[in-house]
């Protein structure tokens, strides 16, 4: 009985705190930073939050894998953009967790870049996209964006584009004039 009590105390005080630091289900760290980006992975909620402090392209982002959404708050434009993620191109939740775990992004080269065009209509009800997106985009106008098909010519002023990088996996161009700015 004495040994059972001692092993219970060991589990309670020694193992439990170390298990709390692990991501349930896969053991990868829940947050990390790479370059100018801070990343938080919530595997249970199928969501990744990104904060990029790069002075040339500062942005916050949420990748909502459950709903297939990308939300990006572009500080240079003082606006948020909401779009569908192309699951064939975007890195998976597991890819990003592995990259954070190994901190070896040279093994995860950039796959390709995507271009999105901002649509003129504003998002009226952010709450329907979940609390994290609503909170991030609360104080700025939010617009939908549409992915451009690869190989189509864009009649867009290249100076209207904001370039963002998702780790080393993927470059995104969000182009178009934001109405009212």
Curated annotation (Swiss-Prot):
The keyword Secreted applies. It comes from the Eukaryota. GO terms for cellular component: extracellular space. Disulfide bonds join 80-137. One of its GO terms (biological process) is regulation of cell population proliferation. Residues 1-20 form the signal peptide. Residues 53-145 form the BRICHOS domain. It is found in: Secreted. Keywords: Disulfide bond, Secreted, Signal. The keyword Repeat does not apply. It holds the Pfam family BRICHOS. Belongs to the gastrokine family. May inhibit gastric epithelial cell proliferation. This is Gastrokine-3. It comes from Sus scrofa (Pig). The lineage of its organism: Eukaryota, Metazoa, Chordata, Craniata, Vertebrata. The gene is GKN3.
């Amino acid at each position: 009985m004495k040994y059972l009590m001692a092993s219970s105390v060991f589990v309670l005080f020694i193992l439990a705190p170390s298990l709390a630091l692990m991501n349930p289900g896969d053991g990868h760290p829940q947050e990390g930073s790479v370059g100018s980006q801070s990343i938080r992975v919530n595997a249970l909620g199928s969501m990744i939050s990104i904060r990029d402090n790069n002075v040339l392209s500062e942005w916050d982002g949420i990748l909502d894998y459950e709903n297939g959404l990308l939300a990006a708050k572009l500080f240079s434009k003082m606006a948020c953009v909401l779009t569908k993620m192309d699951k064939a191109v975007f890195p998976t939740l597991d890819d990003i967790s592995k990259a954070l775990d190994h901190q070896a992004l040279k093994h995860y080269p950039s796959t390709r870049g995507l271009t999105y065009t901002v649509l003129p209509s504003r998002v009226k009800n952010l709450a329907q996209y979940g609390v994290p997106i609503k909170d991030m985009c609360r104080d700025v106008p939010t617009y939908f964006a549409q992915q451009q098909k690869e190989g189509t010519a864009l009649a867009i002023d290249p100076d209207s584009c904001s370039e963002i990088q998702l780790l080393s996996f993927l470059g995104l161009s969000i182009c178009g004039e934001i109405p009212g700015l």
